[in-house]
Amino acid sequence: MCSLGLFPPPPPRGQVTLYEHNNELVTGNSYESPPPDFRGQWINLPVLHLTKDPLKAPGRLDHGTRTAFIHHREQVWKRCINVWHDVGLFGVLNEIANSEEEVFEWVKTACSWALALCGRASSLHGSLFPHLSLRSEDLIAEFAQVTNWSSCCLRVFAWHPHTNKFAVALLDDSIRVYNANSTIVPSLKHRLQRNVAALAWKPLSASVLAVACQSCILIWTLDPTSLSTRPSSGCAQVLSHPGHTPVTSLAWAPNGGWLLSASPVDAVILVWDVSTETCVPLPWFRGGGVTNLLWSPDGSKVLATTPSAVFRVWEAQMWTCEAWPTLSGRCQTGCWSPDGNRLLFTVLGEALIYSLSFPERCGTGKGHVGGAKSATIVADLSETTIQTPDGEERLGGEAHSMVWDPSGERLAVLMKGNPQVQDGNPVILLFRTRNSPVFELLPCGIIQGEPGAQAQLITFHPSFNKGALLSVCWSTGRITHIPLYFVNAQFPRFSPVLGRAQEPPAGGGGSIHEVPLFTETSPTSAPWDPLPGQSSAQPHSPHSHL
């Protein structure tokens, strides 16, 4: 089992992590371009430093025009209709109970009794699921994979699965799309785009972006050849379902066929067919909501975490699930191995990393998840004291988020801020991992940013062919991309897998660069290469029964 006592000391104060070479993290006084030996392997990504000052938070403001008109007392039935659309049944009962002389006394009394009963039922339900008493903004902040979601200027970050393009959701609920091959930065805004909690690019598609919002899901379709920096709201498709708000998690199937959505206040997972704007709810037998969804890279399983001390794994053929209860709290974060046969996760309140294996079944057990009965501990993140050039420092605590690079050889863990550790700043731990023949988890180093900058979000580039590329969003508004140069032990030239590996089609398949949907990038700028002497396999489309 790996422990923090095996980690090398953190970089000296004032130093920033630049890249990894020869299994060691290289630091410098400031962010700079890679050394000449590595510049041929670098991606020309934009340098971003988005400050918080020009951004406002419209999600917390009233966008209505009600304040622009002189107050007029409407009839009670009109007020009830307005309240029904804004609040629901509880608001209608409250409006009638507090009306003056517009309704019969017995109607007001009945509504008052109904309000009291609703209050008792809500109190009982809230005692079972305390998170349901939180506001929408607080719900999102509680379960977001970014630290300090409420006030950070960079709320969500999402790489495109196939190109050097990423989207960033900002504090003002706008979304900017950056492309390494273009200087045009589209800014996406929509009247329903409030409290953005998640972004998800559609696989095998050039420019379809799903956005999880306060009251709906927006599907933006962007023209890669357009020169416009403000796409029309007509480019956005609206998906909504009663009771499914706020939407906090989205997950596309690796073949792009289905979109899953989840909300902490809704006990069901919705499986969307975006083309027809229809959805099918996955059966759920316990309330409490779903906080996070994560599809395995092979498309066979889906991790669904909940606000309670249990998480579920669904299999994507017959859509059955298995549940794993935890002892101390809910599942905080998780990530899949590239082959989908191992799940790493952490539990709220514990400084441990668990591993859950899913042995691959060869033609048997279809319709069953088939995971191990219990998880094993693979890393202990408990606080410990390490020696540094500046003296002794404490390191460790709970993990906030965790990401595994697509090659399966680097694992990054974003720790929660602790006043007794690193002056309360979140720390990024980097591990070396290996899945075969046995699972190994070894310490690599500690990633450090500029003085005063706190790491808030981490993610890996999905198709960096020289090792791994870790993107970090900092509290200062800076987005840094840290290359981790290594030779993939399994594939010397990394080739991403869009599902289970398959034999090339009869007659030979074309290179993935020749797929028409990736016209926005030139072949020379593609971030991966096929294996030498081998054409890329066609993506696998798992057949699902809903």
Curated annotation (Swiss-Prot):
Known tissue expression: Widely expressed. Particularly abundant in cerebellum, corpus callosum, adrenal gland, pituitary gland, gastrointestinal structures and fetal lung.
WD repeat residues: 149-188, 191-230, 243-282, 285-324
Modified residues (Phosphoserine): S33, S495, S511, S522, S525, S541
Function: Plays a role in the normal development of the peripheral and central nervous system. Required for the correct localization of aurora kinase AURKA and the microtubule minus end-binding protein NUMA1 as well as a subset of AURKA targets which ensures proper spindle formation and timely chromosome alignment.
Example of a GO biological process term: mitotic spindle assembly
Region of interest (Disordered), ranges: 500-546
Disrupted gene: phenotype observed: Female mutants are sterile due to delayed oocyte maturation and meiotic spindle assembly.
Database matches in InterPro entries: Aladin (IPR045139), WD40/YVTN_repeat-like_dom_sf (IPR015943), WD40_repeat_dom_sf (IPR036322), WD40_rpt (IPR001680)
Swiss-Prot/TrEMBL keywords: Acetylation, Cytoplasm, Cytoskeleton, mRNA transport, Nuclear pore complex, Nucleus, Phosphoprotein, Protein transport, Repeat, Translocation, Transport, WD repeat
Sequence motif: Microbody targeting signal, positions: 544-546
Keyword DNA-binding found: no
Species per Swiss-Prot/TrEMBL record: Mus musculus
Gene3D superfamilies linked: YVTN repeat-like/Quinoprotein amine dehydrogenase
Name under which the protein is recorded: Aladin
